[in-house]
């Protein structure tokens, strides 16, 4: 019987052929922690009396949620990770000196490789599947186990094959594709499944689109999202390798067999898809942008950023739409780049000047606004159109606020009018 790409990755790591449903002990190529979750893992590590990491070069700590610190508590939280990193001389420790949201930063640093098994104490660790890796979020206790042993136990997930067909229309992005999938499946329709994204549409998706696609796999309950290695992946890795003096390791490339077993197959005609808006209070509450326009939804805040849509292409499209325009008087437009490198490139290319001229404010790379921490908190009854990944009750601030999830083009267009706007109408 054939295997899926996810089954093949686990087979290679387990040293034997394995299939969905089997329990395997797998080595971990990269363990990821952040300023919120790592201190819990560190406490378990130290209380257990352990002094050495199993694989120091395979452990990355990224301070990204509340950095620079927003208050004393977050400063103390970050200090725990910083002290641990210094004590163990961690090579892959990233703080204010080399900032970035972990799921944007690590691929940029050449630390995510096709064929990897990756775990992170953050639910959107599934982002890295865009590079043909198995990558999933786990709890802080599981992260400490990975720190101590260099491995972990997994149940090999069943796979749902998603076949995207056709060329996306203008302003239809990877964000719209995943919002449509979540609309179809619901927030638990892919529970502990691998979402394998395939079809001729993939050739039209940039790496930024693929990161967005895999980033939100968890919003359908998926264990991981994954896109097979191709020429676009290779081009991305070649550039990353050149920028970093090489990749962390050599890629191990896997492809699903034609006779691989899938628990479900979903086909989507992408050519007929228009931008998708997820209404409050679930990412699965998807509607077309046409419906949103007819609903005449006024917004108070527009947010472009996060690990979902804080990449260079997001600022490019936003700058193109906002060039020569002004943000509506009642609207605040907040931009949060995924990494310092993205910020520098967007500045060099003139995107930041264009956006600031239009009335935007630019923050440092941070997860702050997305989780309602800082740098974009919503007040009572405020409405935000956001390129983030969750729109639960109170997610970005007040429990009476509302969040509409959208791609960066829709968000930018909405900043001009002050209402959810179809960028195709501009």
From Swiss-Prot:
A GO molecular-function descriptor: 4 iron, 4 sulfur cluster binding
Catalytic reaction equation(s): (2R,3S)-3-isopropylmalate = (2S)-2-isopropylmalate
Listed EC numbers: 4.2.1.33
Swiss-Prot/TrEMBL keywords: 4Fe-4S, Amino-acid biosynthesis, Branched-chain amino acid biosynthesis, Iron, Iron-sulfur, Leucine biosynthesis, Lyase, Metal-binding
Cited PROSITE patterns: ACONITASE_2
Cofactor(s) the record lists: [4Fe-4S] cluster
Pfam family, one: Aconitase
UniProt-listed InterPro entries: Acnase/IPM_dHydase_lsu_aba_1/3, Acoase/IPM_deHydtase_lsu_aba, Aconitase_4Fe-4S_BS, Aconitase_4Fe-4S_dom, HAcnase/IPMdehydase_lsu_prok, Homoacnase/IPMdehydase_lsu, IPM_dehydratase_rel_enz, IPMI_cat
Note on how the cofactor is bound: Binds 1 [4Fe-4S] cluster per subunit.
Superkingdom of the source species: Bacteria
A GO BP entry: L-leucine biosynthetic process
Protein's pathway: Amino-acid biosynthesis; L-leucine biosynthesis; L-leucine from 3-methyl-2-oxobutanoate: step 2/4
Amino-acid positions noted as binding [4Fe-4S] cluster in the UniProt annotation, renumbered to this chain: 307, 367, 370
Functional summary from the UniProt entry: Catalyzes the isomerization between 2-isopropylmalate and 3-isopropylmalate, via the formation of 2-isopropylmaleate.
Similarity comment: Belongs to the aconitase/IPM isomerase family. LeuC type 2 subfamily.
Self-association state and partner proteins as the record states: Heterodimer of LeuC and LeuD.
Full protein name: 3-isopropylmalate dehydratase large subunit
Lineage: Bacteria, Pseudomonadati, Campylobacterota, Epsilonproteobacteria, Campylobacterales
């Amino acid at each position: 019987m054939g295997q899926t790409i996810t089954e093949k990755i686990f087979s290679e790591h387990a040293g034997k052929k394995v299939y969905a449903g089997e329990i395997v002990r797998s080595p971990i190529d990269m363990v990821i922690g952040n300023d919120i979750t790592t201190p819990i893992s560190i406490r378990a590590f130290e209380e257990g009396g352990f002094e050495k990491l199993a694989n120091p070069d395979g452990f990355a700590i990224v301070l990204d949620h509340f950095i620079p610190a927003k208050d004393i508590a977050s400063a103390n939280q970050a200090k725990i990770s910083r002290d641990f990193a210094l004590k163990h001389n961690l090579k892959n420790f990233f703080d204010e000196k080399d900032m970035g949201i972990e799921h944007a930063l690590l691929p940029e640093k050449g630390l995510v490789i096709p064929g990897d098994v990756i775990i992170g104490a953050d639910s959107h660790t599934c982002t890295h599947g865009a590079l043909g890796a198995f990558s999933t979020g786990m709890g802080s206790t599981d992260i400490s186990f990975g720190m101590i042993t260099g491995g972990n136990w997994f149940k090999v997930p069943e796979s749902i094959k998603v076949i995207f067909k056709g060329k996306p229309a203008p302003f239809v992005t990877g964000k719209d594709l995943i919002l449509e999938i979540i609309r179809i499946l619901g927030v638990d329709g892919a529970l502990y499944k691998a979402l394998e994204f395939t079809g001729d549409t993939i050739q039209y998706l940039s790496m930024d689109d693929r990161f967005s696609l895999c980033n939100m796999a968890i919003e359908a309950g998926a264990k991981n999202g994954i896109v097979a290695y191709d020429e676009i992946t290779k081009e991305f890795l070649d550039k990353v390798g050149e920028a970093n003096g090489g990749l962390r390791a050599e890629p191990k490339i896997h492809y699903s067999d034609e006779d691989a077993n899938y628990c479900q197959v979903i086909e989507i005609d992408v050519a007929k898809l228009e931008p998708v808006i997820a209404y409050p209070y679930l990412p699965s509450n998807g509607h077309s942008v046409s419906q949103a326009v007819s609903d005449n939804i006024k917004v108070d805040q527009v947010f472009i950023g996060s690990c979902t849509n804080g990449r260079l292409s997001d600022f490019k499209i936003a700058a193109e739409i906002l060039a020569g325009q002004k943000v509506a008087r009642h609207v605040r437009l907040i931009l949060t780049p995924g990494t310092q490198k993205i910020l520098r490139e967007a500045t060099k290319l003139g995107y930041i000047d264009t956006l600031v001229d239009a009335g935007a404010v630019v923050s440092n790379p941070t997860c702050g606004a997305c989780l309602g921490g800082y740098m974009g908190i919503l007040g009572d009854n405020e409405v935000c159109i956001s390129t983030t990944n969750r729109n639960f009750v109170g997610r970005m601030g007040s429990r009476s606020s509302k969040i509409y999830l959208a791609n960066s083009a829709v968000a930018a267009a909405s900043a001009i009018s002050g209402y959810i706007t179809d960028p195709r109408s501009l």
